[in-house]
Every structure is written in C-alpha cells, then in structure tokens.
C-alpha cells in the first residue's frame, strides 16, 4: 500500500469551527464554535462516527445525517469499500443513494494497490478530517471496520498492536480519543439481521456478484495469502468453485454436481457473513468495555418491515417510515445535542 501514502501531505492546521447546522425538522439554526488546539488544549474537534455490523444500514444513516446537518461530508472506514471496480462484491453504496454528499476514501483505490493498514488509514482519514474541519464542514465517519475506527480515533495508537486480536487484553483499547466524538451504533437483532443478509446475498447475485467474483479469480494466487479486496466474503468461497467449474464453462449444461457445488458455495458465503456479524459485534462490545461511549440505535423493526414488505407490529408503516421515526429522528436529536456541547 506504499503508493497510497503518496497521497499524504503535511497535515493541515485545524480551524476547529464546526458547521452551522440546519435540519429539516424545523429546529433553530445550531452553531457550535470550538477553538483550535493551539487556543484551548481541552477543546477537541468534533467528529460523528456511525458504526455497526454489516447490513444494518450504516451507509444509509450517514447520508440521512449528512443531508440534514449541512455542510457535512462522509469518510468511509470500511476496509473493503476503499477499493473501486468491484462495487457489488464490496457492497459499496451506489452513487444514486449517496444523496449528492461527497464521500472520501470510498471506491478510491485499485485492488492492485495492496492492503491499507490501520496506520495508513489513520493518516489518510486524519487528513480528510482536517480538510473538512478547516472548511467548516462536519466529518461523518462511517464503517464497520473496527480496527480502522480505533486506529483513527485513539489518542494513543501503536501500529504494532492489534487490539482485536484473539487474547488481546482490554488495556489495548485506548479510551482517550483524539476528537470529541458522537458514536452511533446501528444494531439489529441477529435472527432478523441474518435473514436480511441472506436475502442481500441473493440480491447481490442477481445484480452480477458472480461475474465480478469471476473477474477477481486468479488460479495462481495463494489461497492462504489473501490481501486487500480478496479478503471480501465471497472471494474465497467462489475461488474454490471456479477451480472446479471455470467461468468459461457457464454456457454448458449444469449437471447435478455443479448445481450442488454452486448452492453449497452460496450457502457458505451466507454462513460466513453471519459469522462476521458476531465478530464485529464482539469488537464493538470490547470498545464499550474499553471506555468508548457508544449510543445504540435499534433498527430491528425497520429491517423486519423491509423483510415482510408490509407492516411491522400492525402499525401499517413501511420500513422507510419506521427507519425515519426510530433511527433518523433519534440520531438527529443525538447529533444536535452533541453539536451544542462545548
């Protein structure tokens, strides 16, 4: 990832003036003014972080907030979504869903650039935050890669220590943060989320997932040394499938063995996605135990309504209406209060 670091330049000084915030809910204009580090040592620049496991709606919420707290821009902290060219594989938020909000470190690097380390992400994201704050814009960081989130926000960061490695102690989590943070955790109860994720895999396949995975397939790549985008769920599973059934065989008739192998591959991808949820949630809980103040938002009802494609709990509301009421409105109030704090 050496070539990525050439994008870095000396960090900008923080003006530390956060944006004038307007909302669509008729609230008065909110102004939060903070002096820079040189003016008052106890005042830190403000950053909003949206975290959570895969498939909970983090990207959607980041756009919802950015369009209500203008001017705001979004910084991606998903380690797979930094890559371009494989938008279905990495489940990158499509342009038409970005709401016209500028996104940083999203679909920016080629897979051949290598793997971005937490230390490199810290440098790149810090530069983006500095530029936004100096332009009086609110930085909204969004992503479920907890190693990136910890690296970016921790006041004390050791690139040689992985605080989420098996057996690592709680003391490896730095509770002192570099910024004054409002951290929102979008959560969904596992049985509902697992069904949603399985459906999402099916939708990704319909959108061309297998074709993109075929482009990534390289028979000479050591399966034990996966780096960068090749760590994305689905790559390993379909690599095994493509070794037996190369893509050029698609025009032929699928026998029972091939159909069974394909179905087993898709099943393995779904199961691995659900296991990832458990790992991500464990890391979030470790951050909380380590002293991070994280506000949980329960999006279960909204996701369940989307699954049912009808009503939730007899209220006659669709998933988007429930999302607006229980996630967006609550988040707006939390962020408004956060921006008013000195």
Curated annotation (Swiss-Prot):
GO terms for biological process: cytokinin biosynthetic process. SUPFAM superfamilies: P-loop containing nucleoside triphosphate hydrolases. Belongs to the IPP transferase family. Due to a nucleotide deletion that would cause a frameshift, IPT6 seems to be a pseudogene in cv. Wassilewskija. It catalyses: dimethylallyl diphosphate + ADP = N(6)-(dimethylallyl)adenosine 5'-diphosphate + diphosphate; dimethylallyl diphosphate + ATP = N(6)-(dimethylallyl)adenosine 5'-triphosphate + diphosphate. Keywords: ATP-binding, Chloroplast, Cytokinin biosynthesis, Nucleotide-binding, Plastid, Transferase, Transit peptide. It is an enzyme of class 2 (transferase). Residues 1-33 form a transit peptide. Its EC number is 2.5.1.112. It comes from the Eukaryota. Expressed in siliques, at the mRNA level. One of its GO terms (cellular component) is chloroplast. It is found in: Plastid, Chloroplast. The keyword Metal-binding does not apply. Involved in cytokinin biosynthesis. Catalyzes the transfer of an isopentenyl group from dimethylallyl diphosphate (DMAPP) to ATP and ADP. ATP binds at residues 52-59. This is Adenylate isopentenyltransferase 6, chloroplastic. Its main location: plastid. The keyword Plastid applies. Pfam families: IPPT. GO terms for molecular function: ATP binding; ATP/ADP dimethylallyltransferase activity.
């Amino acid at each position: 990832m050496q070539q990525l670091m050439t994008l870095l330049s000396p960090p900008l000084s923080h003006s530390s003036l956060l944006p004038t915030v307007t909302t669509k809910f008729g609230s008065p204009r909110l102004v939060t003014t903070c002096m820079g580090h040189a003016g008052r040592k106890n005042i830190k620049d403000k950053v909003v972080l949206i975290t959570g496991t895969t498939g909970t709606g983090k990207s959607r919420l980041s756009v919802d907030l950015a369009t209500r707290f203008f001017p705001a821009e979004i910084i991606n902290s998903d380690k797979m979504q930094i890559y371009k060219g494989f938008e279905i594989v990495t489940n990158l938020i499509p342009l038409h869903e970005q709401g016209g909000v500028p996104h940083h470190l999203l679909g920016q690097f080629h897979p051949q650039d290598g793997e971005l380390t937490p230390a490199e992400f810290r440098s790149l994201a810090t530069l983006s935050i500095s530029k936004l704050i100096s332009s009086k814009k609110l930085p909204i960081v969004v992503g479920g890669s907890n190693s990136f989130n910890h690296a970016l926000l921790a006041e004390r960061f050791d690139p040689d220590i992985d605080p989420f490695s098996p057996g690592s102690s709680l003391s490896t989590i730095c509770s002192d943060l570099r910024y004054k943070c409002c951290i929102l955790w979008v959560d969904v109860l596992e049985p509902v989320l697992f069904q949603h994720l399985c459906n999402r895999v099916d939708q990704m396949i319909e959108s061309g997932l297998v074709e993109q995975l075929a482009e990534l397939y390289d028979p000479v790549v050591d399966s034990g040394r996966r780096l960068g985008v090749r760590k994305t769920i689905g790559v390993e599973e379909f690599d095994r499938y493509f070794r037996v059934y190369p893509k050029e065989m698609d025009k032929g008739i699928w026998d029972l063995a091939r159909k069974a192998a394909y179905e087993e591959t898709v099943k393995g991808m779904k199961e691995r996605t659900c296991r990832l949820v458990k790992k991500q949630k464990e890391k979030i809980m470790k951050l909380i135990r380590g002293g991070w103040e994280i506000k949980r938002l329960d999006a279960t009802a909204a996701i369940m309504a989307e699954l049912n494609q009808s009503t939730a709990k007899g209220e006659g509301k669709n998933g988007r209406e429930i999302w607006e009421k229980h996630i967006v409105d609550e988040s707006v109030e939390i962020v408004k209060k956060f921006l008013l704090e000195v």
